[in-house]
């Protein structure tokens, strides 16, 4: 009987995508490093493996990168413990092949699972252990766990603890924290990375390091600097935050015909300065008019969470934001986990078990961009934006208010620098459902034009952007002799003055630039 290891080796060697013996050499190395040849056969998927396509697709969250022409990995490695991660790093480095690190697969540009050179995907989705310690008010969370799984495990142990992460439950913890994730408690508690207590990372030499052994600089860098530039984060230890027994949510829609412009103008002054327990996200979308057949208008939708009861919220908004006209019938009181579900699916009948569903192999075609607003946009400016949005057709905007805790934390505390001085962040958003080059080109052109139109209203020198809303239009690192100069272009936008420190950390811990992607942190130029 042929051993499983040899069967897989034969499979890989016969792969049409195999480049020489690189993939076979990798498998031999992995078997040797783990000393578990039978186990290795269950971890590695060659292109000839019947399950290869389903494993690849499971965590592709942008359908733009799920096409026949999208570059495919030579192999997919799906480790189940940290020693297998070590082995994958060592073996990929030994044979000189690029390693892509994927947790939830939500990178907007597919950077975690595509490349223009031969590559291997290190799929972290099986590393999903979550250990919650309510006495310590902390949790160790593996990088392949999802936010939904994390929230569920916290809720299992306590109804008065939570974590200030994002509102999309299928997002992977590794990428979310690695890029400085945020959620609807950021005005009260700041970013996810403001609550990281420790971490375990595999470095470029295949060593496992924790906070003490990695040192202050690397620990700083992996909390929002794009952790995949520095190593493979296996797990983060996070601090939980207190949440009240009652949380209040609401969703209110207004159209231009209902004084939406006045409401948006006032929102800019209120949302970043009001009680830090209140987070009011605003969606701005071009839609068909309800009153004028065949015409387009703008609809705004305010989606909010208040860490308190309904009476407190209505009293607060009637005083600070009467233009909104919030009424008792607009609000819902829930516990914290109920608010998580409401934000995720807007369904009052869903149980928390839904958070454990990863919904694999589901993806829209999407394009995203980001900006920061530091001065309120005038009413004339808003009307200019509405006009352009209606002309373009489909691209929407999402306004996320800052202030509160975000203004109290120094810009240098973590690599994420966008703190005091920012009123709100803009996410540009366009989704579509059908494949095709012309559709992709059309919507890409739309979102780029809208981004250009907003230039006068957003931050300057640099025009800042958010790493976790990845956008290759703002710069790409081609990993050649100009790597540092190319990195400065997007690095200044994502990290502002923190970019230089990130480069120094990168040069110290990964001088050979093994961990790299289209927007990774470069090393310092080598002296002649």
Feature-to-residue mapping (PLM):
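Soluble FAD-dependent oxygen oxidases
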Residues: 1-528
């Amino acid at each position: 009987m042929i051993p499983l290891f040899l069967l897989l080796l034969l499979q890989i060697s016969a792969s049409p995508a195999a480049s020489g013996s690189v993939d076979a050499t990798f498998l031999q190395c992995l078997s040797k490093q783990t000393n578990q040849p039978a186990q290795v056969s269950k971890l590695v998927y060659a292109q000839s493996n019947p399950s290869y396509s389903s494993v690849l697709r499971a965590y592709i969250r942008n359908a733009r990168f799920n096409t026949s022409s999208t570059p495919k990995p030579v192999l997919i490695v799906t480790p189940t413990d940290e020693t297998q991660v070590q082995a994958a790093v060592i073996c990929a480095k030994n044979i000189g092949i690029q390693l892509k690190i994927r947790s939830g697969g939500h990178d907007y540009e597919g950077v975690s699972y595509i490349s223009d050179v031969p590559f291997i995907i290190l799929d972290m989705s099986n590393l999903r252990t979550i250990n919650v310690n309510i006495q310590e008010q902390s949790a160790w969370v593996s990088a392949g766990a999802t936010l939904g799984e994390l929230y569920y495990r916290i809720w299992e142990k306590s109804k008065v603890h939570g974590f200030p992460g994002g509102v999309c439950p299928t997002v992977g913890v590794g990428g979310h924290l690695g890029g400085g994730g945020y959620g609807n408690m950021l005005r009260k508690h700041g970013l996810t990375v403001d609550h990281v207590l420790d971490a375990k990372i595999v470095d470029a030499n295949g060593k496992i390091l924790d906070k003490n052994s990695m040192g202050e600089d690397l620990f700083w860098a992996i909390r929002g600097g794009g952790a995949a530039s520095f190593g493979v984060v296996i797990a983060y230890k996070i601090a939980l935050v207190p949440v009240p027994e009652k949380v209040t949510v609401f969703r209110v829609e207004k159209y231009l015909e209902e004084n939406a412009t006045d409401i948006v103008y006032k929102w800019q002054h209120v949302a970043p300065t009001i009680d830090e327990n209140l987070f009011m996200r605003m969606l701005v979308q071009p839609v068909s008019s309800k009153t004028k057949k065949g015409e387009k208008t703008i609809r705004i939708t305010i989606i909010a969470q208040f860490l308190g009861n309904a009476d407190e919220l209505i009293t607060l908004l009637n005083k600070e934001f009467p233009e909104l006209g919030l009424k008792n019938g607009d609000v819902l009181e829930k516990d914290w986990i109920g608010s998580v579900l409401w934000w995720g699916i807007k369904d009052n009948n869903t149980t928390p078990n839904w958070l454990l569903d990863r919904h694999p192999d589901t993806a829209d075609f999407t394009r995203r961009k980001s900006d920061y607003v530091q001065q309120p946009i005038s009413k004339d400016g808003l009307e200019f934006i509405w006009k352009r949005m209606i002309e373009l057709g489909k691209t929407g905007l999402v306004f996320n208010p800052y202030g509160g805790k975000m203004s109290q934390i120094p810009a240098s505390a973590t690599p994420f620098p966008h703190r005091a001085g920012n009123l709100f962040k803009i996410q540009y958003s366009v989704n579509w459902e059908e494949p095709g080059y012309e559709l992709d080109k059309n919507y890409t052109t739309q979102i780029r034009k809208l981004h250009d139109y907003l230039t006068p209203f957003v931050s300057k020198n640099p025009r800042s952007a958010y790493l976790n809303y990845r956008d290759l239009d703002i710069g790409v690192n081609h990993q050649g002799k100009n790597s540092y100069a190319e990195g400065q272009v997007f690095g200044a936008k994502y990290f502002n003055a923190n970019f230089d420190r990130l480069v120094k950390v990168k040069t110290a811990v990964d001088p050979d630039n093994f961990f790299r992607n289209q927007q990774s942190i470069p090393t310092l130029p080598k002296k002649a």
